[in-house]
Amino acid sequence: MMFSSIDSLLKISTSSQNEDQKLESHPSPPSQIPNYSTSCSEELMKMAAKAAQFAAQASLENSFSSSTSPTSTVTPLSAYTSLVQPVLPLIYDHLALTYSVNAWQAWGKMRRPRTAFSSEQLVQLEKQFSDNRYLSRPRRYQLAQQLSLSETQIKIWFQNRRMKNKRCPSSTPIQSTSSS
């Protein structure tokens, strides 16, 4: 990351020192359980900000130490991994809940509740089915709006009604055809 001026470097280092002093005045125990009420993205944003401050401070310290000594100091990897550790329990716990041993058994048993159509809705659906066994998309949309149902519910009802008609043809409503 390139900085536009030395002033911006100094602002970052002084702001990180101020934040370090604030953190030192309110020490938190190292075994503190992470707050699960905040979202994962918020945690990642906080960690990215801490990492940027840490990297800026480390590069600033390295630039000063390289001017005083011929060898540059290398920051150990453990200093960076300590920034990542608070998020790992969030991710692990989420995955543990999602992919637990018995989750697949419970997932197979979960079903949407059966839609209970009102008598008015059934009369209208049966009337439409007697006119035409297949609905066009615009007609399905219009019928869904009229009956306060979703298009998917209308589509599934028509599929089920066609299968019922196929199994027992006597269930088809008699179409009244007038001869003139």
Swiss-Prot record:
A single MF term (Gene Ontology): DNA binding
Localization (cell): Nucleus
Keywords, ordered alphabetically: Developmental protein, DNA-binding, Homeobox, Nucleus
Matches recorded under SMART domains: HOX (SM00389)
Major localization class: nucleus
Region span, Disordered: 15-37
Job description of the protein: Transcription factor. Plays a role, downstream from homeobox protein unc-4 and Wnt signaling, in specifying synaptic inputs to A-class motor neurons. Involved in patterning of the synaptic outputs of the postmitotic DA class cholinergic motor neurons.
UniProt name for this protein: Homeobox protein ceh-12
